[in-house]
Regions:
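N-terminal DNA-binding recognition helix of tyrosine site-specific recombinases/integrases
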Residues: 49, 78-111, 160-162
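Short pre-functional
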Residues: 94-95, 150-163, 265
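Active-site/catalytic core of tyrosine-dependent DNA strand-transfer enzymes
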Residues: 132, 196-250
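Conserved tyrosine-mediated DNA breakage-rejoining catalytic core shared by Y-recombinases
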Residues: 169-205
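Flexible interdomain linker/hinge and immediately adjacent N-terminus
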Residues: 70-71, 106-139, 220-226
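Short, basic (Lys/Arg/His-rich) helix/loop patches that form interaction surfaces
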Residues: 142-144, 237-270
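Basic/aromatic-enriched alpha-helical hairpins
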Residues: 2, 6-79
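Conserved catalytic core of the tyrosine transesterase superfamily
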Residues: 137-154
Length: 270
């Protein structure tokens, strides 16, 4: 029994030299191999954020304590992160830390006991149907990227607030007999929407789209599709914010707003 305890103690002492970065890299690789790409990306974003806080210096898992995590929380707030963003990063780091504890890599020191890991209720930011009409009728012919951003916003609105990731991966074969049928990336739920002229008008604006996808978001067959999607959503949201300023909106205009605007308009009809 004494020998067994000594061996376990020795293993903990050695394993405690494992760093947060190396441990998370293994987790990220495992998530990617199991097809959980979005989750792996959130872990990667969390690790990148924490490493910026550490000025690129790695930290031993055994050295993670409450003081360090409180410092990271202060850093995030100073960067302008919302409390939900702070909580998002902290919960991923806590899950990673607890996994290391479960595997016997380190002893539990409860480094997250003084930082925020809750979820604040966010304000649903919708715009009125009047503003949506103004957006639709804006002359954006001077900027191809702004016009594309507006078209993607309107397509989302027309399709009951479809998320951008679902829009990006819509295939031409998903459209049959006047119905658009697709499976949500986030939940796996199968949805069907009646195909309307307003949707077809947007698709027809981009006749040079020769990929298997319905919309010209993922257009390069041999390039990383996830990367194309991420680059596109960043550019679209950036252009939408510019459009929002032109419209005199108080809050930033993003693809997220399209989803809530459709829900708001739909509720108003009932």
């Amino acid at each position: 029994m004494v020998e067994s305890t000594r061996v376990r103690s020795k293993r903990l002492s050695f394993s405690g030299k494992k760093t947060l970065s190396s441990f998370m890299q293994v987790n990220i690789a495992s998530l990617r191999q199991s097809g959980k790409l979005r989750t792996s990306e959130t872990y990667r974003a969390t690790l990148n954020s924490f490493m910026k806080f550490m000025d690129g210096k790695d930290v031993l898992l055994s050295n993670m304590d409450a003081e360090l995590m409180m410092g990271y929380e202060t850093y995030l707030k100073a960067q302008g992160a919302s409390m939900n963003t702070v909580s998002f990063y902290m919960r991923i780091l806590r899950a990673t830390y607890n996994r290391a504890v479960d595997k016997g890599v380190i002893r539990q020191r409860f480094p997250f006991k003084h930082v925020y890991t809750g979820v604040e209720k966010t304000v649903k930011r919708a715009i009125s149907f009047k503003v949506i009409r103004q957006l639709k009728e804006m002359d954006l012919s001077h900027s191809q990227s702004m016009e594309f951003a507006r078209d993607m916003f309107m397509f989302s609105f027309y399709t009951r607030g479809m998320s951008f990731v679902d829009m990006a991966f819509l295939k031409k074969t998903d459209l049959n007999n006047g119905m658009l049928t697709y499976r949500r990336k986030k939940t796996g739920q199968l949805l069907s929407i009646r195909w309307e002229k307003c949707m077809q008008d947007i698709v027809d604006k981009y006749p040079g789209n020769f990929s298997t996808y319905l919309l010209p978001i993922i257009i390069h067959i041999r390039k990383d599709e996830r990367l194309q999607y991420k680059n596109s959503i960043c550019l679209v949201n950036r252009r939408l914010k510019e459009i929002g300023k032109k419209l005199g909106l108080v809050h930033p205009l993003t693809m997220y707003v399209a989803r809530h605007s459709w829900a708001s308009v739909a509720r108003g009809k009932h």
